[in-house]
From Swiss-Prot:
One of its GO terms (molecular function) is transmembrane transporter activity. Glycans are attached at residues 187, 200, 416. Exhibits choline transporter activity, as choline/H+ antiporter. Also acts as a low-affinity ethanolamine/H+ antiporter, regulating the supply of extracellular ethanolamine (Etn) for the CDP-Etn pathway, redistribute intracellular Etn and balance the CDP-Cho and CDP-Etn arms of the Kennedy pathway. Interacts with COCH. One of its GO terms (biological process) is ethanolamine transport. N-glycosylated. Residues 55-232, 278-315, 386-453, 525-562, 620-637 are extracellular. This is Choline transporter-like protein 2. It comes from Rattus norvegicus. Pfam families: Choline_transpo. Residues 1-33, 254-256, 337-364, 477-503, 584-598, 659-705 are cytoplasmic.
């Protein structure tokens, strides 16, 4: 038995030895992982430089406003097209070209106009009639009618034909409608293309479809934005309710941990039960209604998600999912009922620790603020990088041309290239560039994403070390709370920044590398979806699974390494090794106690999110009679509901993360305490009387007195 024990400890390190001078987090410590600290500083300097360069070259207006063939904005104040908000395509049929999907523009001249055409005219018929004054507004600015028809159409100065159109997302699209199953534009089923040929309206449909693909997503985004503008204050109220519920729950947990845990468990079961009942009620209500028996597969994807709520199969799917969750939770509670009692004792001890360090409940606000800064800087830099390209002009021609697709200058184009491409046009193609900066844009975007992951993980690591240091000072105080420092949270925060910035940078760097690899794998997966190579797909799934597991393991290891850093002040690698071996020597306790506690915290989050989500659902669907006239009219009521649910989860997660870090810290300290001490007068346990009673441990000195 002794040999087995010696072999086990040799494989997972040796237990901590008794140190009479150890009284908790070490104050006399030195800087750790200085190289990583310097590396982080240089990376931040580079990141700021990238942001400045992006902000210098970028123009976010390119995301909002359409541009004509010259790259000039339509409807933008302060430009010559300020009174021309709509983009008009000379030949919408050419938008059916695959070039639209590759370079996101139609290979046809485009100009900004005050209004979309409301009548059918050809250039040939309008040129020598009184309709030409109307027609001329759809020609290029400054057009002079001093050329022949063929030259005008060749040079792309006027469209060959205009047809009745309607604006959509500031673009003019043919006003196509169906009459008795026949597609028509205006009152015609065919149209003349301006060259003496009549074409079917379906050609216009194909062109409009390709040009409209991106615009459908934009229209959906605009409708969602409209919903936010009329419901944002109600969303804020819902998030405030979630915050108050989280605070109330934690305050009650401080005094009534055992009762609250069981109440929480029952409430989650009841909430899921109500969800099952509601789904069944909707499923029964739709029985016999026209169209309610259509399957989800037959319906396909619809941008208006409310359509799915009129299908019985949707509510059946919801009911099955909720029923599975209900059964799984009940089974887990049955098999883990004894372990729940142990977890409750840990939560009570954590409640006492949080009670003595109450300012720790406000620390998630610091983390949230710093994360918002990281997200804002990353998002703005990303937008400016993506819009920092310059207008690139390409030579286009309807006939073969040796310079076709070459870059050109619209100011000098007719002089230099007219001999080789007599029918060519220098047309705006896309926003890009041929400078070193423009060629490096993809790399800068990757660097931007990588720095976001690194800084975000650093902020989270700083919070974990700070909380761990504060709660460790509580555990290692022999007389709680008399032996605790005056300001444990601020002391831990100062130690983390002063001594361990390098270690935090090291741990967050490792995690950021794994996360950026996962992002690249997701990108490659999207590119390979159309491929038929099954081996490549299988390999991609395996890689994604492996890196997902690796990220979870690194997060777990980092979390415990940060606790050891907060206590002992050792570097990252030493702390990670010691934490890992300590957990491996107590793997059963880790699996049972720590994970059961995490499960209980998850139930608490579900209770808060479920309660606020149900309240938001009834409010935004006008089902609360008292305030049904107060709820705003919406395009998609699920927009504010999902926002409230996600926001409530993040708020609850922020508050429960403090408790979770407290439990993890106390648990690790508890394992150290068991290895360092034996309860004798010389080596007394630091754990509280509750934990000693729970584990049948006593301090002999206390027993003798």
């Amino acid at each position: 038995m002794g040999k087995d024990s010696q072999h086990y400890y040799g494989k997972h390190g040796t237990p901590q030895k008794y140190d009479p001078t150890f009284k908790g987090p070490i104050y006399n410590r030195g800087c750790t992982d200085i190289i990583c600290c310097v590396l982080l500083f240089l990376a931040i300097v580079g990141y700021v430089a990238v942001g400045i360069i992006a902000w210098t070259h970028g123009d976010p207006r390119k995301v909002i406003y359409p541009t004509d063939s010259r790259g000039e904005f339509c409807g933008q104040k302060g430009t010559k097209n300020a009174d021309k908000p709509f983009l008009f395509y000379f030949n919408i049929v050419k938008c059916a070209s695959p070039l639209v999907l590759l370079e996101f523009h139609c290979p046809t001249p485009q100009i900004c106009v005050k209004q979309c055409p409301d009548r059918y005219l050809t250039f040939l018929s309008a040129r020598n009639s009184r309709d030409f004054d109307y027609y001329k507004q759809f020609c290029v600015p400054g057009f002079k009618n001093n050329k022949g028809v063929a030259e005008v159409l060749r040079d792309g100065e006027c469209p060959a034909v205009i047809i009745p159109s309607k604006p959509l997302a500031q673009r003019c699209f043919p006003a196509i409608h169906a009459s008795k199953g026949v597609l028509m534009v205006g009152n015609e089923t065919t149209y003349e293309d301006g060259h003496g040929t009549r074409k079917n309206v379906t050609d216009l449909v194909e062109g409009a479809k390709k040009a409209n693909k991106v615009l459908e997503a934009r229209q959906l985004a605009m409708q969602i934005f409209e919903d936010y503008t009329v419901s944002w204050y109600w969303i804020v109220i819902g998030l405030v309710i979630a915050m108050l519920l989280s605070l109330m729950f934690i305050v009650l947990l401080r005094f009534l941990a055992g009762v609250m845990v069981w109440v929480m468990i029952v409430m989650v079961i009841l909430v899921l039960g109500y969800g099952i009942f509601h789904c069944y009620a909707e499923y029964s209500r739709l029985r016999g209604e026209a169209g309610s028996d259509v399957s989800l597969v037959d319906l396909g994807f619809q941008t208006d998600l409310r359509v799915y709520l009129h299908l019985r199969q949707t509510w059946m799917a919801f009911m099955i999912i909720l029923s599975i969750l209900e059964v799984v939770i009940i089974l887990l509670l049955i098999f883990l009922r004894k372990r729940i009692l142990i977890a409750i004792a840990l939560i009570k001890e954590a409640s006492r620790a949080v009670g003595h360090v109450m300012c720790s409940m406000l620390y998630p606000l610091v983390t949230f603020f710093l994360l918002c800064l990281c997200i804002a800087y990353w998002a703005s830099t990303s937008v400016f990088l993506s819009t920092s390209n310059v207008a690139v002009y390409k030579i286009v021609d309807d006939t073969p041309c040796p310079l076709l697709g070459k870059t050109c200058n619209p100011e000098t184009f007719p002089l230099n290239e007219s001999r080789q491409c007599p029918n060519g046009r220098c047309q705006f193609a896309f926003y890009g560039g041929e400078s070193t900066y423009h060629r490096a844009l993809l790399g800068l975007q990757i660097f931007n994403a990588f720095m976001f992951f690194w800084l975000a993980n650093f902020v989270l690591a700083l919070g974990q070390v700070t909380l761990a240091g504060a709660f460790a000072s509580y555990y290692w105080a022999m007389r709680k709370p008399d032996d605790m420092p005056a300001f444990p949270l601020f002391s831990a925060f100062g130690r983390a920044l002063r001594y361990h910035t390098g270690s935090l940078a090291f741990g967050s760097l490792i995690l950021a590398i794994v996360q950026i690899i996962r992002v690249m794998l997701e990108y490659l997966d999207q590119r390979l979806k159309a491929a038929q190579n099954k081996f490549a797909k299988f390999l991609m799934v395996c890689l994604k699974c492996c890196f997902w597991c690796l990220e979870k393991f690194i997060k777990f290891l980092n979390r415990n390494a940060y606790i050891m850093i907060a206590i002992y002040g050792t570097n990252f690698c030493t702390s990670a090794r010691n934490a890992f071996f300590l957990l491996m020597r107590n793997i059963i306790r880790v699996a049972v106690l720590d994970k059961v506690t995490d499960f209980l915290f998850l139930l608490g989050k579900l209770l808060i999110v479920g309660s606020v989500g149900i309240l938001a659902f009834f409010f935004f669907t006008h089902r609360i009679r008292i305030v049904q006239d107060t709820a705003p009219p919406l395009n998609y009521y699920w927009v504010p509901i999902l926002t409230v649910i996600i926001g409530s989860y993040l708020i609850a997660h922020g508050f429960f993360s403090v408790y979770g870090m407290c439990v993890d810290t106390l648990f690790l300290c508890f394992l150290e305490d068991l290895e360092r001490n034996d309860g004798s007068a010389e080596r007394p346990y630091f754990m509280s009387s509750t934990l000693k009673k729970l584990l049948n441990k006593t301090n002999k000195k206390v027993a003798e007195s």
